[in-house]
Amino acid sequence: TVTGRFSMSNPNLQQIPSRGIIGKKMRELFLPEEGCVWGSFDYSQQEPRIVVHYALKLGLPGTDTLKDEFNKDDADFHQIVADMAQISRTMAKTINLGLFYGMGKIKLQNELNLTREKANALFSAYHAKVPFVRRLSQDLIEFAEEHKLLFTLEDRFCRFNKWETRNREWNNTINRYEPVPILTKEDAETAFKAELLEKFKDNVADNYMQDFDRYYKPAFTYKALNRLIQGSAADMTKKAMVDLYEQGILPQIQIHDELCL
């Protein structure tokens, strides 16, 4: 995937159902080698710990409470944040994961089933008490827009190589910006030149591309935090797979933060 996670198809063994009669019957089809048993191991709070790691590394405000707590094996990021923001754990988890995955305010509001006024009050309280999540996200968005890439925990490039126009119109009917085409760099440059030719009646300076970044920007930078989190988590899990293999243990399947042996 774009973040470095593994994906599967035909069949997708990462999404075998586990609940209900059918799910249980499907899982009974998978048998360990003779004389062996299945073992399933996953990371504890892998993605939230990555967020805290980078927030601490950058010295962002609001991380003092987390520094010691997050080294504990049984750390519960969502409960820690709930206590910091003085909200329920359910609300804290919804907001945390929403921000981690680049969810907008309106979608978060709908997920929480709140009115706009109550949602705004909740978000204000959250960001006042837990400022490092939004600050980290904003810093990463700015970095991604400037450099067109991020580096994951293992220094792997996570590129932003699609482009979109900065000129977006707000649609009051759907209460969001109008969708815009997502383009390759070549197509974005072609579109930019066509816009200039139309605007200036074919009288375009030879150095017109110097203004390209004023009108176009890398697409999906609002997901920069998600790219960093999932990309770094993928690095950690893949490294664990290699380490296990070198010790003579063969992972049978990887499901994001979980390894089945």
What do the predicted segments below correspond to?
Residues V51, G104-E117, H127-P131, L259-L261:
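Catalytic palm subdomain of template-directed nucleic-acid polymerases
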Residues A85-M103, L244-Q247:
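Amphipathic, charged-and-aliphatic alpha-helical interface segments
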Residues A92-K93, K105, Y222, H256:
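Residue-level signal for cytosolic alpha-helical hairpin/rod architecture
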Residues A119-S124, R135-Q138:
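Phosphate-binding glycine-rich/basic clefts of nucleotide- and phosphate-handling proteins
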